[in-house]
């Protein structure tokens, strides 16, 4: 009897979850300085969209269709399914038809009968899909199964126009269009959300500090041991098995506010565009930098050498080349101990360095060991 009494009075962790839901609802909205909701920094494992794709035909074009051989083959196959046979060797002259690829993202928990938006893109040499209609196209997933069926009239933002002399103009991209609510979901994607007694939260930006804070925040409100940080990206949380309780539990859980850990110090450089992004935590050790510009200008002109009227010789064109080298005075700026982002920006602006010069300075500081940040060149 004593053992039965102990088991009856013992509270299972999942029972603590159910009893704490009301208290959690009162506490989870407490304001925290610099805090973010869990739903903004993490996703639930297994809750994701899936890509689906298909191949079909767009008809009704105003003479802007393609002339690809696979378009002709696809059209013949479609007509055969309708019981119409096109004689071999006959050119159907498909100026109003274009072969297209159709793709879409199938949102998580999509149910049969729901509508989703689709994107239609020409795969041949069609000039424009404007005014066309997509015929019924099966959209399949990576497993080869059909999850949606697409059909409808295209909305094309781009257009093109041309003249009889061959001149033409194109605005945006007329070979790609959209069909809002253009596909109907026919099959639901299996989800692991309602299985098991745990949920896993995956951080969008893996960070050990953030994972630890999410774990502690959940355990402080629901009870010790319910949340466990698995690694820098994942936090495993015990959750009710019943679907309705699991949904309610997660709706409260995702609105908890947590202060994320500070991002690692990074400097991102786009060498093609000259864009430089400096993170907030970037610091520079004491260092002095001098950077001078050497400008070499080569100009080439042509002069005329014409002899006197009584002298022999021919008038010739003589090239005249001028090489000029200018070196601007080198300017030096110095960083004090633990210089911050503001110090770097202010010093660079005072020197008046171009983006290319800034890249060279940052790379030199990194090589010298004075730049305490990860330098990423994209």
Curated annotation (Swiss-Prot):
It is found in: Periplasm; Bacterial flagellum basal body. Keywords: Bacterial flagellum, Periplasm, Signal. The keyword Signal applies. Pfam families: FlgI. One of its GO terms (biological process) is bacterial-type flagellum-dependent cell motility. InterPro entries: Flag_FlgI. It comes from the Bacteria. Disulfide bonds: none annotated. Its main location: periplasm. One of its GO terms (cellular component) is bacterial-type flagellum basal body, distal rod, P ring. Residues 1-33 form the signal peptide. Assembles around the rod to form the L-ring and probably protects the motor/basal body from shearing forces during rotation. This is Flagellar P-ring protein 2. It comes from Hahella chejuensis (strain KCTC 2396). The gene is flgI2.
């Amino acid at each position: 009897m004593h053992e039965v009494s102990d088991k009856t009075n013992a509270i299972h962790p999942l029972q603590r979850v159910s009893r704490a839901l009301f208290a959690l609802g009162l506490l989870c909205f407490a304001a925290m300085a610099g805090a973010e909701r869990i739903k903004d920094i993490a996703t639930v494992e297994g809750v994701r969209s899936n890509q689906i794709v298909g191949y079909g035909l767009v008809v009704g074009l105003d003479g802007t269709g393609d002339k690809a051989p696979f378009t002709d083959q696809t059209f013949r196959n479609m007509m055969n399914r309708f019981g119409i046979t096109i004689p071999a060797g006959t050119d159907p002259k498909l100026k109003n038809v274009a072969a297209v690829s159709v793709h879409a993202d199938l949102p998580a928990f999509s149910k049969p009968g729901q509508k989703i938006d689709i994107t239609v893109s020409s795969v041949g040499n069609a000039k424009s899909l404007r005014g066309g209609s997509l015929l019924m196209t099966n959209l399949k997933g990576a497993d080869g199964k059909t999850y949606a069926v697409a059909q409808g009239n295209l909305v094309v933002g781009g257009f093109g126009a041309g003249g009889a002399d061959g001149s033409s103009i194109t605005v945006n991209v007329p070979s790609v269009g959209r069909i809002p609510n253009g596909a109907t979901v026919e099959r639901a994607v299996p989800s692991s959300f309602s299985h098991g007694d745990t949920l896993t939260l995956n951080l969008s930006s893996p960070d050990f500090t953030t994972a630890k804070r999410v774990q502690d925040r959940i355990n402080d409100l629901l009870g010790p041991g319910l949340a466990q940080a698995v690694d820098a990206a994942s936090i495993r949380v015990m959750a009710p098995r019943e679907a309705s309780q699991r949904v309610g539990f997660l709706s409260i859980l995702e609105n908890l506010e947590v202060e994320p850990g500070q991002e690692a110090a990074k400097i991102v450089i786009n060498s093609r565009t000259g864009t430089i992004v400096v993170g907030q935590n970037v610091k520079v050790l004491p260092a002095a930098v001098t950077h001078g510009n050497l400008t070499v200008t080569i100009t080439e002109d042509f002069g005329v050498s014409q002899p006197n009227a009584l002298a022999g010789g021919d008038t010739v064109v003589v090239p005249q080349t001028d090489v000029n080298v200018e070196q601007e005075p080198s300017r030096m700026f110095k960083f004090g101990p633990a210089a911050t982002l503001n110090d770097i920006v202010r010093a660079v602006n005072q020197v008046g360095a171009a983006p290319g010069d800034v890249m060279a300075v940052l790379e030199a500081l990194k090589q010298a060991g004075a730049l305490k940040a990860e330098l990423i060149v994209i």
